Amino acid sequence: MAPDAVARTAVDQGAPGFYDSGLAPTPYMGWNTYYGLGAPTEKEVRSVADRLVSSGLRDSGYDIVWLDGGWQADNPRDAQGHLVANPDRFPSGIPALVSYLHKRGLRAGIYTDGGTYDGGKSCGLGSRGYYDQDARQFANWKIDAIKVDFLCGIGAKLDPGPAYKEFSDAVAKSGRRMLLNLCNPLTDDWGLPHTPEQDAHNTYVYAPAIADSWRTGTDIAWGTPSPGEWPNILRNMDANAWHPEAQGPGHYNDPDYLIPMRKMTDGSYELTQEESTSQFVMWAEMGSPLVLGSDPRTLSDSMLATLRNPEIIAVDQDPLAVQGVRVATDSAGDVYSKVLQGRGQRAVVLLNRSDQPAQRTVHFSDTGLGGPVRVRDLRARTDRGTHTGSYTVEVPAHGTAFLKLTGADVLPGTDLGVTATASPAVASGGAAFFRGPHGSLVEKADGRARDLGGPVHGGILGQPAVYASAGGRIDVFVRGDDSRAYRRIYADGRWGHWQSLGGQLADAPSVAFTDPAHWTLLATGTDGTVVQRGPASGWSSLGAPGDRQVYGRPSAAVDAQGRVHVAVRGAADDVWTRSRDTAGEWSGWTSLGGTVSGSPTLVAVGDTVLLYARAADYTLWQQRYAEGAWQGWSKRQEFPSAAFDGALGAVAGPEGAVDAVFRGVDGHVYRTRIK
């Protein structure tokens, strides 16, 4: 594997671990019965399955045939509590249908609800009280994917997070790997009183650790095709765009199904072909699951050809699984950019939300590209030449232009010419430290790279923490391959041996360093809380904001008054801080808000403390602590969207500046000065 390929697929060793069934390394694809058939029948499902094969949709990736509600009997359980298929609609039973699908190279999906069955008032079946039993039954039926609705859960006013966690655990114990999709559709659109925890827009907080995918909003349409559907496409798309940072390989935001060209009773279409294509394009740009809701037997040859377009599908299936984000907007629409695998490549959508054709422009600098940029039209599968600065095209009403741009990544600072596989750190004086291509700790100083190995099996995990002090001394703290903390010291012109600091860490440590005899090491423990230790003390817990597990690596700094500041990425991808005064007393946790896609970085500069974090749209933002308070978020304009991965490494520079290092989108380590 080429070094840049290694770099692009590497990530920081984050905590907690994201869910990964192994069944969806890229967004899954298929067809679901709900919007196309309503209550399905065995005969119709087999007919659609055959059409998926004959139309080429299966070979394009649409390989899951997913039964939604209505497959179950009117009384969904037998005397032993087992789920039962409707004998009139599925006379051969579910296992026979699964076998039929498997023989045709298709996978089988099924539906249940996470709540308790209430006799049909809210849902047609419910698995609460039967999670283990139902998961085993689905496994015995050789089901490949499960959709878990929450209609009866909503009716009972349950908190979906704990319920879905129980169901996820049941699937893990079932003896069969099955893709898990969570479908809590409750939003304010329902007009029902509910807590924030019960809202679909909150699912991203817990779902990435327990499921392959999760709905990010309410249903995109009614079961019966209806006029005025275009605003609902935009509504679900915009809701899905709120938390792109929650998505990654094996775990995906789900804005609901594709509903191309469903025909209404008057013979007209719910969505035009252009609107249907715009939905398909935007779902691909967001790296969403591509599940058809329309009946493919009713689609025109031209619509089917669009849905099979290999260049559009390739954007959705890009192995980085980055969700494209908005990088520019105006009164007519938006520009979205998505980083693709390989250097200098972006997928860009020019969306026209308006009711009239409009000239739409992408400025290459908004995508982090410079130099001559090659433009390819993915919808037309045609090259559009090489351009400098920008590209403009007319886009129809409710339409899209879908482009692949290939140019040079433009990143702030100086390329150090070395590849990192996690976020780097920097010491005063300029030496950079990072996890190299082979997993070992590497030092880059004075133009030379030196491999420092690692404490266990020659490797480290995640971002190192470093501090330079008087006499040329450098202290380095790392998480070893055994998840313990280690320290190594450079003094008197040579590196000493690794020293174990114990602990069991879920992410790399950071250090609040006063001098070699006075420091506090902080990390995320295996229980998701922040843990600390000093030179002589053992590990102890600082808890976590709201008693919910934190993501990633805490950051720490000591200010000019000797206070220790700690910042973490919370469960809701917001930033929280707390501080320890010179008497050793810790404050409570304080929310700084924000929505971040990487661990925060703290650095003390003069009388202030600066906090940097990569935002949800992959840009860099900062806060300043001065006069006893944090001053609010501001954007660093020198960092375009997706310029870097993970977290900055930072140290105080001259005249109030910050010297920073980061792992660029190309996998290289860069050094820059932030003023």
Language-model region placement:
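C-terminal beta-strand-rich structural cap/linker in extracellular carbohydrate-active enzymes
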Residues: 387-411
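A structural motif
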Residues: 409-675
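Catalytic cores of secreted or luminal carbohydrate-active enzymes
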Residues: 281-326, 400-408
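Structural recognition of the beta-strand scaffold that forms the well-ordered cores
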Residues: 27-33, 61-68, 107-112, 144-149, ...
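Carbohydrate-binding surface patches
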Residues: 283-286, 291-293, 329-369
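N-terminal module-boundary/linker segments of secreted carbohydrate-active enzymes
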Residues: 2-46, 51, 178, 187, ...
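Glycan-recognition surfaces
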Residues: 130, 179-295
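Aromatic-lined carbohydrate-binding/catalytic grooves of carbohydrate-active enzymes
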Residues: 48, 52-157
